[in-house]
Design a protein with these regions (language model features):
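N-terminal beta-strand motif that seeds the catalytic metal site of vicinal oxygen chelate
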Residues: 1-16, 67, 125-126
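Core segments of cupin and vicinal oxygen chelate
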Residues: 7-48
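Vicinal oxygen chelate
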Residues: 10-14, 69-115
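Short beta-strand micro-motifs in enzyme catalytic cores
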Residues: 37-39, 65, 105-109
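Active-site beta-strand termini and strand-to-loop segments that position acidic
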Residues: 40-45, 111-114, 124
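Long, continuous compositionally biased terminal/linker segments
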Residues: 42-79, 85
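A short acidic/small-residue loop/turn micro-motif
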Residues: 100-101, 124-126
Length: 126
């Protein structure tokens, strides 16, 4: 169901050092940065990222966090976005569509739920 979990940080280098060590102890490779400065840790079963919030505000347990849900097709990404927006969610960031991530191409749609939690649907083309 989940594709990734992202948490916010106010000190990326301290977070990278911590997660490289803690996740490294579990056999996870060191984190890799993306173009937005987030540090990504990926396994065959999913990904974890840490980064400063994209809105420029201070990180907290909710600001800077994202919960990503897996979508089997690009059409499901769009359907997720449309259904969520119609049910009280708010479309955020770029419009739904293809992106280039640190591990290859993907299709994304981002929403905030009625409580303000940031979620997304993500499809990774084969």
């Amino acid at each position: 169901m989940f594709t990734h979990v992202t948490v916010g940080s106010n000190d990326i280098e301290a977070s990278r050092k911590f997660y490289d060590a803690a996740l490294g102890a579990l056999g996870v490779d060191p984190g890799q940065p993306d173009a937005k400065g987030r540090i990504w840790y990926r396994t065959a079963r999913g990904a974890f990222a840490v980064g400063t919030p994209l809105d420029g505000e201070a990180a907290s347990c909710a600001n800077g966090g994202t919960i990503g849900f897996a979508a089997r097709t690009p059409e499901m990404v769009q359907a997720f976005h449309d259904a969520g927006a119609a049910a009280g969610g708010v479309s955020i960031e770029d419009p739904p569509g293809p992106r280039q991530g640190p591990f290859g191409p993907l299709v994304l749609a981002y929403l905030r739920d009625p409580s303000g939690n940031k979620i997304c649907a993500l499809h990774r083309p084969a």
